[in-house]
From Swiss-Prot:
Active site residues of this protein: K37, Y271
GO molecular function per UniProt: alanine racemase activity; pyridoxal phosphate binding
Function: Catalyzes the interconversion of L-alanine and D-alanine. May also act on other amino acids.
PANTHER family the record matches: ALANINE RACEMASE, ALANINE RACEMASE, CATABOLIC-RELATED
Positions of post-translational N6-(pyridoxal phosphate)lysine modification: K37
Binding-site residues, substrate: R135, M319
The EC number(s) this enzyme carries: 5.1.1.1
Pathway per the UniProt entry: Amino-acid biosynthesis; D-alanine biosynthesis; D-alanine from L-alanine: step 1/1
Organism domain of life: Bacteria
The family this protein is said to belong to: Belongs to the alanine racemase family.
Protein name: Alanine racemase
Secreted recorded as keyword: no
Protein source organism: Helicobacter pylori (strain G27)
Gene, per the UniProt record: alr
GO biological process, one term: D-alanine biosynthetic process
C-alpha cells in the first residue's frame, strides 16, 4: 500500500534491457561498473543495484560515503567504488566497510595509508587522472608517475585501479574525447614501461560506451562505467539522434488526483496569483510538489497525462502539491496522473521536461526525492 498519493514507477524490465545494451557494446571480456549514485539516478539504488548485479555487473559506483554504506548493508561482498572525493575523516569508515576510494594526491594517500596501518587492514584505491575535465585528478605527466611510485610504496593501500573521466564524449565531434583518450593511453603505456600495472583501467561513461567503442581508443580499458544510459536516456540529443542503440525509459513520475473542485470564474489558483480562471474551472489537486522533485518552474508550462488525455499543469507548483485543469477531461478523484515518463500514455519523458527548463534529463530524474516511494513493475 502506498504511503502517499504520489510515487516513482520504475520499470525493471527496462533496467535489464538497458544493462543488456551495455553488454552488447563493450568487449565481451570487459568488467562493468554500474553507476548508481544519486539513488541510482532516481530509480532507487538498492533495487537497481540488485538488478544490475543479477545481469552481470562486477562493480558498483557511487559519489559519496553515505551512498556506499547504504549499498554495503545490502551487498556485503560487492566491490563498491566512491567516485567522488572522500574526506580524510572518512578513512576508517572506508576501511572498515571494505569500500574503494578515489585518490588524486600523495597527501591524501599518505593519510589513508596511516589509517589502514592503524586498523591492520588494507584500503583499495583507484587513482584519478585528469586528461581534460579539469575537475579532480593527477596530471598525466612524468611528475605524476613519480607520485604514483610513492603511493605504491605506501603500506596499507592496494592500488586496484586507475581511471579518467570524459567531459565531452556526447558531442557530435569527438575530437576532445579522443584527445583525452590519447593522453590517458599514453600515460598508461608510460606506466607499463615502468612495470606499473593496474587490475582495473577505466574511462568510458555512457557517452564513451555509446560512441567510442568502435575505435581503438579503448584498447587498454577493461572496466566500463555506464550511468545515465542504464536509466533509459542518451547523454545528449546529438547522441539520441545518431546512436543505433535502443534504450528504454525506466522512470515515470506519477500521482493521484486527491481532490477535484470547481473554481468559479475570476479566481486565482495557488500561490502568487499565477493562474487566473477566465472561466469556471475544474481543478484537480495532486499530492506532489517541488520538494518531491517536480520543478516549481513547470507550473503553467507542461501538460500531464490522465487516462490517455492531456491536461495542463496550472499555477505555481507548491512544495508538496500542485494543480491540473480538468475542463474537458474525463477524470475522477483517485485517477492516476503521469507527470513524466511513459510515452505510450502520451506523457512527456524526462528529457522533454529538461529541455523546457534548459537543463538535462540527469537533473530531472536524479532530483526525485527519496520521500517518494519507488514502485517496481
Amino acid at each position: 500500500m502506498l504511503k502517499r498519493a504520489s510515487f516513482v514507477e520504475v520499470d525493471t524490465a527496462s533496467l535489464r534491457h538497458n544493462f543488456s545494451a551495455v553488454k552488447s557494446i563493450v568487449p565481451k571480456d570487459a568488467h562493468i561498473m554500474a553507476v548508481v549514485k544519486a539513488n541510482a539516478y532516481g530509480a532507487g539504488a538498492i533495487k537497481a543495484s540488485e538488478i544490475f548485479l543479477q545481469e552481470g555487473a562486477n562493480y558498483l559506483g557511487v559519489a559519496a560515503l553515505d551512498e556506499a554504506l547504504e549499498l554495503r548493508s545490502h551487498f556485503p561482498k560487492t566491490p563498491i567504488l566512491i567516485l567522488g572525493y572522500s574526506p580524510n575523516t572518512n578513512a576508517s569508515m572506508l576501511i572498515d566497510n571494505d569500500l574503494s576510494a578515489m585518490i588524486f594526491s600523495l597527501e591524501q594517500a599518505e593519510v589513508f595509508s596511516q589509517m589502514a596501518l592503524k586498523s591492520q587492514k588494507r584500503l583499495k584505491i583507484h587513482l584519478k587522472i585528469d586528461t581534460g575535465m579539469h575537475r579532480l585528478g593527477l596530471e598525466p605527466n612524468f611528475k605524476s608517475i613519480e607520485i604514483i611510485k610513492k603511493i605504491r610504496a605506501l603500506k596499507g593501500l592496494e592500488i586496484e585501479g586507475i581511471f579518467t573521466h570524459l567531459s565531452n564524449a556526447d558531442a557530435k565531434i569527438k575530437t576532445h574525447a579522443k584527445n583525452q583518450m590519447k593522453a590517458f593511453n599514453a600515460f598508461l603505456e608510460q606506466l607499463l614501461d615502468q612495470k606499473i600495472e593496474f587490475q582495473y583501467r577505466h574511462a568510458y561513461n555512457s557517452a564513451g560506451i555509446l560512441s567510442l567503442c568502435n575505435g581503438n581508443e579503448n584498447r587498454l580499458l577493461n572496466l566500463y562505467r555506464p550511468g545515465i544510459m542504464l536509466y533509459g536516456f542518451y547523454p545528449s540529443n546529438e547522441m539520441k539522434e545518431s546512436c543505433p542503440t535502443i534504450l528504454k525509459n525506466v522512470i515515470s513520475l506519477k500521482a493521484q488526483i486527491v481532490q477535484i473542485r470547481s473554481v468559479k470564474k475570476g479566481e486565482f489558483i495557488g500561490y502568487g496569483e499565477h493562474f487566473y480562471t477566465n472561466e469556471e474551472t475544474l481543478v484537480g489537486v495532486l499530492a506532489l510538489g517541488y520538494a518531491d522533485g517536480l520543478m516549481r518552474a513547470l507550473g503553467n508550462r507542461i501538460q500531464v497525462a490522465i487516462n490517455n488525455q492531456l491536461a495542463p499543469l496550472i499555477g505555481k507548483v507548491c512544495m508538496d502539491q500542485c494543480f491540473v485543469k480538468l475542463n474537458d477531461i474525463q477524470a475522477k478523484e483517485g485517477d492516476e496522473v503521469i507527470l513524466f515518463g511513459d510515452k505510450s500514455a502520451r506523457a512527456n519523458d524526462a528529457s522533454e521536461i529538461a529541455a523546457l527548463l534548459n537543463t538535462i534529463a540527469y537533473e530531472t530524474i536524479s532530483t526525485l526525492s527519496k520521500r517518494l516511494e519507488r514502485v517496481y513493475i
